[in-house]
Amino acid sequence: MLLFCIPDFNEALKLMSSALDHCSFVAIDGEFTGLHSGSSPGVFDTPAERYQHLKENCCDFLLIQLGVCIFKYEKQKKGYGYVAYPFNFYVFPRPSMRAAPDQRFLCQSSSIDFLVSHGFDFNKLFYKGIGYLTAVDNMRVKEMVQQRHAQYEGNASLLSDCSPNFNSPSTAKRPVDVPEEHKPFIDDVCKRVGEFTAGTDEELKLEPCTGYQRKLVYQTIKSRHPSGLHLDTHTTEDKKERFIVVRRVTEEEKKKLAQDKLQAELDDVDEASGICRVMKMIAESGKVVVGHNMMLDVIHMMHQFTGPLPDTLVEFKSMVGCVFSRLLDTKVMANTQPFKELFPITGLTDLMCKCDEEPFRRPHIVIPPTNFTDYTVNQKFHEAAYDAYITGVCFATMANYLGSFLTPPKPRVSPTSNLIEPFLNK
């Protein structure tokens, strides 16, 4: 269960939650539909200019695969080592509910070709990719759900935390204006509901109809039968059409059904947050988050899973700090003393190769055989979880090297050590 998609996403969250408990650090990586819609950033750009360029030229592309590798330190019988838990998520902004944003995005042909050449499964991305709702969209959709329920039920108490400017007049107090072309349909529904109320059946299933017709049915029946009935929308077995079920209820039952339905829809909104739940779990763990040349990864993660990017680098750093309090870039680390002379080339593959040579000693790392592909024997460069895995391996190796400067030398340096502080949040 290495590649996590819709069917097993909740199982992945359980595994991730367990792995995050008492872990040492987390490594991340992303794959994108493109890199730059214009020119690449200049080599002499200031950090502020680089941020502005990336913000303006990259955010129309999507992060479509998120790799997360969680490293948990365990003292082995023969030395010191880590257990690594790699998670690979396909990410696609599917409109999982009616009020969710219907996103547009760019693709860069060279980037798509590159991903295909490395085995990226676009069928899995589009068919089973995990969606997401940012915190801003989550609140907006919840407000829309609450307003709609309050309008249908004529009950302002259902608006627990909606906008104070929202006015919820009871639909029962307003005449329903039914367009001429829909009057025969509504008249037939009213006749059937009238016969139902005069009978003894517990429920009445109406014929499938359009969303607008359902709205008219709700408003009309609510107006003519303000009490004693509860209306709910269901989906046909083939999931192609929707219809209304009318039930007899007491006022107490009606109120509880309305509250239960509202809560279920609010829970669905939280469920639709999708990959944002992964971000939240990592953020709440407070662990060091490691990436390689990670500026672009962080920009996309903030933009897609948190909210709109601010205008300035200072504001962006503040935004990132609210989510990831401790970030470490292995490329920056490799370009900083005492590593600078040891890494003439700082690409991720080159970094990995150098970490296998003196004076470095890679720590012993194992991957659980159940639920995870063993990256220790299977190289899959440019699969996000694999790149996150080797990024974490490089970081652990470089961190341990710092221990050789201590007196006496230490074979392992923790991510929380003071020796790591100079490389954080750069």
Name every feature range the model reports, one short phrase each.
Residues 4-63, 67-69:
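Entry/capping segment at the start of metal-dependent catalytic domains
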Residues 38-47, 58-426:
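Metal-dependent phosphoesterase core characteristic of DEDDh/y 3'-5' exonuclease domains
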